[in-house]
Amino acid sequence: MNSASHPGRPVTTAAGLWFLVAATGLAIFASYIGISYGRAALGGPPGQSRWVAGDWLGNGLLSVHLVFALLLTAIGVLQLIPPLRRRVPALHRNLGRVFMVGAVLGTLSGFYLVWVKGTVGGFVMHAAISLNGLFILAFAWLAWREARARRFAEHRRWALRLFMAVNGVWFFRVGLMLWLMVWRAPVGFDPKTFTGPFVYALSFAQFLLPLLVLELYLRTRGRGRMLAVTLVLLSLATAGGIFGATMGMWLPRVV
């Protein structure tokens, strides 16, 4: 049977391609988090740890943030695998609870790390990160509410939005390294302070762009040749960014 008999098949196939690419990149990212910060927690080489002597609150929240970053990266991919949802629904429910609680705790600890402990990027970048966090909190609550009400179609939509928002930090790194691969130089930003028009734009695009593409997918019900082409192009761009991030950012820090 040809694709005309199944108008949604090209988009479904393209979406599946993007998911496979993203799942691979997220697995690499999760491995990086586990190895890099696990080594630091066990007393690895100086300079790898972001802990500050005597800052028990900051260090504790940093630990919470990193642990949930690792868990959310791994669990998020598992939650989107259809056979797992169908064959082991109890596991899907329990992992979903961990994911939503982790998203909330990771976001709240992130607010502290950005606004109290401090990080690079300046006010614009911090505001974008905080807006991303507010989206995460809202999507987590809405996904939980719909699941409790057994409105599973709506729950799935909010859970997908939550997945995109939670992975904003990953999208940022992939987008940044794709940009650097294209220009072969830090065009549009200062790499020392992480300020400048490009990183400001990317700070918002890291969650707004994935959410926009997801909304197009949900509202068109997976139909449309242009959407399929867009998803294939995004898959290629994502693969390029993953390669750049792996070779230029993650791998050098763990070997």
Task: Report each predicted region and the residues it spans.
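Alpha-helical membrane insertion/targeting regions
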Residues: 2-255
